[in-house]
Amino acid sequence: MTSILTNNSAMAALSTLRSISSSMEDTQSRISSGLRVGSASDNAAYWSIATTMRSDNQALSAVQDALGLGAAKVDTAYSGMESAIEVVKEIKAKLVAATEDGVDKAKIQEEITQLKDQLTSIADAASFSGENWLQADLSGGAVTKSVVGSFVRDGSGSVAVKKVDYSLNANSVLFDTVGDTGILDKVYNVSQASVTLTVNTNGVESQHTVAAYSLESLTEAGAEFQGNYALQGGNSYVKVENVWVRAETAATGATGQEIAATTTAAGTITADSWVVDVGNAPAANVSAGQSVANINIVGMGAAALDALISGVDAALTDMTSAAASLGSISSRIDLQSEFVNKLSDSIESGVGRLVDADMNEESTRLKALQTQQQLAIQALSIANSDSQNVLSLFR
């Protein structure tokens, strides 16, 4: 039926044209933005995941920047420590030279003074962005320095920033800015070699080799030994598990220390039940007397020089250990930085697979829609001409 009030063919053609135009708009939007899922209305689940992961990727970018800053701090500290080690090696060599008979120790001291000033200069200069890891205030104990290492999200959705920690303590900083507990401003005590103790128990003597102890391992005054008391054959016995002999600090080894203790049936200490007698102090410590930072060898004797050389060598050991720790952290930061780069690329790639548009597919679809649009316009034109055909009947 032909009607001049309702043109069903034109309405159908117009509806088709509108649908094609809407599809073209969507396709053009995907082509211009490059996104298949550009908003939550396109795909709520994928859009939500992509938005969250993009946010995490931005956080990882900040982590990457922080790792670069941390690497610079560590590298600066390592370079300073490495330079300081070379200077302390020179000081040690000067001290060894000073042990030679007839040398002018005052002249050697002048050279050592310049080297000490160089150590101070190195420690002061080893700073990056206001952070100095070669000197610190240790009056309140160790100071922890941190470098941002990663940004993580667990299965429950909780996020956290992980850090790489480095402790500034008496064995890792060159100078204590307030006290004297840094590697270069503390006095080292050097343990003597092990000695042999002669133990006399009820008249029977036996020898026992006792290794020297470092200062830190000595038991404080007032400590007690542990053991069991027993009676057998009319004699008193004490089974000793731990005996500590107090070590004296002296320029040379102290002698003549002894421990004497006895037991009776009642457990009272009387006399001569057992005796530990030593010819030399079993755990004596020779004090270097000076730190690396305040060395003065003018007028120093041979024994004191030997102790000082041992003290400087102990400082070198601590510095080498600290440099190794810094090197390990530097290596870890490099590995973490490489990992964060790869992780960021993986996240970006994963998000792309979720929301990116396939440009080949979209361009092909656009060509097809343009053809459909032209045909729909032609169909609408034909449908609109039906009313003109009706008018021709009345001519």
From Swiss-Prot:
Pfam families per record: Flagellin_C (PF00700), Flagellin_N (PF00669)
SUPFAM superfamilies: Phase 1 flagellin (SSF64518)
Domain of life: Bacteria
CC annotations in GO: bacterial-type flagellum; extracellular region
Record keywords, A-Z: Bacterial flagellum, Secreted
Molecular-function annotations in GO: structural molecule activity
Location of this chain's protein in the cell: Secreted; Bacterial flagellum
Role this protein plays: Flagellin is the subunit protein which polymerizes to form the filaments of bacterial flagella. Homomer of FlaA is able to form a functional filament.
Family: Belongs to the bacterial flagellin family.
Identification of the protein by name: Flagellin A
Organism per entry: Rhizobium meliloti
Taxonomic lineage: Bacteria, Pseudomonadati, Pseudomonadota, Alphaproteobacteria, Hyphomicrobiales
